[in-house]
């Protein structure tokens, strides 16, 4: 069957906009909820934190699938790519249904176990029961979206995301301001919009991709083993990152009594995320190209493509982060009028220039290594330096030396840059060439 072979730019632009819309939907939800109450925002944020922990489990399959599917597509075996999708779909669906039932039934017990603030309990319980009870959608959407992307169909996934977000916005407005459903309304709107998103990506995949008709097949156990071989380390890295960031925030909460430092980090993060989404899109697009080239044994093209993606990423990250730093004094005023807070956010955005350069390099080379089959090395780097540099740096520079949020950002930037150097050196060693999944 015909694969939609595309360039780095053609693949990355739709992925970038899809990531951007995903980020904006979260911001819109927060802004609309804030009109109800600060407690509602806090409750939903808390519930989403715990839902995210469970969603990591679904990443084991979806991230491993991309490597297996792209390499087999590059090797001219789309039938095996279809087989990988089917196995991933079944595996994720079974786990997701069990997880959905667990969250729906035991939402209150989970929140009591983590000692949530009493003022947030009822709203968080409502949200966790509804959205958590439908978390199977979070397991299935990435499977179908990845399936479209690896065959070169990135616009369809983008349109599904846009339509889902528009529906979410409209339903939020109706449920919040017309029907006065509060948190229950936001949760219901979230679930309905995700159902629409799932229907679109599943339908587009069935209509556009005919890999099912290709005759290539191998033992299902072998495919599942390959998926887990790549996906499990990737999911571990995500889990380690989330735990590390939890510790960083915990240290930052100890820096003052009014929460200024951790709040400044939140504002700086919201601004810097626009730079991050471009780097993430380039990394995902290059991962697809890398898989295609490795499947076809085109190793020189892998090197050229990954270097090109990293250069594009560094240039865009530099331009955006420098712009944000220079205009930080004005951008921060969107969130707050507190002069001290604005000055602190501006300082963090200046350090963020270095952080973003490390992060985009880390993303591009790290994703390329995972797609090539060399998935363990990024986890080892993360396990060591996320905790030594990011967590340890936050404690040492932020608390011990008294640099507070500025010190925390020095630690975070150090982590990204050290890991970036490690990823580049690992890629240049060429060891990933022997980790391919296709015979």
What residue ranges belong to the model's regions?
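Short runs within selected transmembrane alpha-helices of multi-pass transporters and secretion channels
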Residues: 62, 130-149, 157-168, 186-201, ...
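Residue-level hotspots within pore-lining transmembrane alpha-helices
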Residues: 17, 21, 25, 54-58, ...
């Amino acid at each position: 069957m015909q694969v939609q072979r595309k360039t780095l730019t053609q693949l990355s632009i739709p992925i970038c906009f899809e990531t951007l819309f995903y980020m904006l939907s979260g911001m819109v939800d927060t802004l609309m909820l804030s009109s109800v109450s600060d407690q509602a925002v806090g409750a939903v944020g808390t519930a989403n934190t715990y839902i995210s922990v469970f969603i990591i489990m679904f990443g084991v399959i979806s991230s491993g699938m991309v490597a297996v599917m792209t390499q087999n597509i590059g090797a001219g075996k789309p039938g095996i790519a279809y087989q990988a999708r089917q196995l991933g779909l079944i595996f994720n669906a079974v786990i997701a249904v069990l997880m959905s039932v667990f969250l729906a039934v035991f939402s209150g017990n989970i929140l009591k176990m983590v000692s949530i603030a009493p003022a947030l309990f009822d709203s968080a319980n409502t949200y966790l029961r509804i959205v958590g009870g439908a978390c199977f959608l979070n397991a299935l959407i990435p499977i179908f979206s990845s399936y479209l992307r690896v065959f070169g169909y990135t616009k369809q996934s983008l349109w599904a995301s846009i339509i889902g977000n528009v529906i979410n916005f409209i339903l939020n407005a109706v449920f919040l301001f017309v029907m006065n459903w509060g948190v229950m309304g936001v949760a219901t709107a979230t679930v309905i919009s995700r159902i629409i998103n799932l229907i679109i990506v599943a339908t587009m995949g069935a209509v556009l991709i005919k890999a099912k008709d290709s005759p290539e097949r191998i033992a299902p156990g072998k495919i599942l083993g390959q998926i887990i071989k790549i996906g499990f380390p990737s999911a571990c890295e995500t889990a380690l990152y989330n735990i590390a960031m939890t510790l960083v925030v915990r240290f930052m909460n100890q820096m003052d009594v009014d929460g200024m430092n951790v709040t400044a980090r939140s504002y700086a993060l919201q601004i810097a995320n626009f730079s991050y989404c471009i780097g993430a899109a380039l990394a995902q697009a290059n991962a697809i190209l890398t898989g295609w080239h490795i499947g076809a044994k085109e190793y020189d093209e892998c090197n050229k493509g990954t270097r090109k993606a990293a250069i594009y990423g560094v240039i865009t990250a530099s331009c955006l982060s420098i712009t944000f730093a220079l205009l930080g004094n004005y951008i921060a005023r969107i969130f707050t009028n507190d002069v001290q807070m604005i000055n602190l956010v501006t300082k963090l955005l200046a350090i963020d220039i270095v952080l973003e350069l490390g992060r985009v390099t880390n993303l591009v080379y790290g994703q390329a290594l995972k797609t090539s089959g060399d998935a363990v090395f990024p986890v080892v780097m993360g396990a060591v330096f996320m905790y030594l540099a990011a967590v340890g740096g936050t404690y040492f520079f932020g608390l011990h030396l008294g640099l507070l949020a500025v010190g925390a950002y020095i630690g975070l930037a150090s982590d990204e840059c050290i890991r970036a150097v490690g990823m580049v050196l690992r890629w240049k060693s060429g060891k990933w060439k022997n980790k391919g999944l296709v015979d």
